Amino acid sequence: MNKMAMIDLAKLFLASKITAIEFSERICVERRRLYGVKDLSPNILNCGEELFMAAERFEPDADRANYEIDDNGLKVEVRSILEKFKL
């Protein structure tokens, strides 16, 4: 298991190597894989959780609620999260 997989996905997304939809789908899978893992650093765990929450707010449809974000909004949030955790 790659404990950095969520961070790696975020970096792939920011580099435009995967789409926002791929990021939002794959981040959920990686999050599930980390359930019960006890030796994660708090920094990685918290960053992963924030990335997951940002992905949950992503809505590709133009008809989105005011709390939902589009591709560009997701990129801004993901970049901000990685900077916050210095990753």
From Swiss-Prot:
The keyword Transit peptide does not apply. Transmembrane segments: none annotated. It holds the Pfam family Colicin_immun. The keyword Mitochondrion does not apply. Keywords: Bacteriocin immunity, Plasmid. One of its GO terms (biological process) is bacteriocin immunity. InterPro entries: Colicin_D_immunity_dom, Colicin_D_sf. GO terms for molecular function: toxic substance binding. This protein is able to protect a cell, which harbors the plasmid ColD-CA23 encoding colicin D, against colicin D. This is Colicin-D immunity protein. It comes from Escherichia coli.
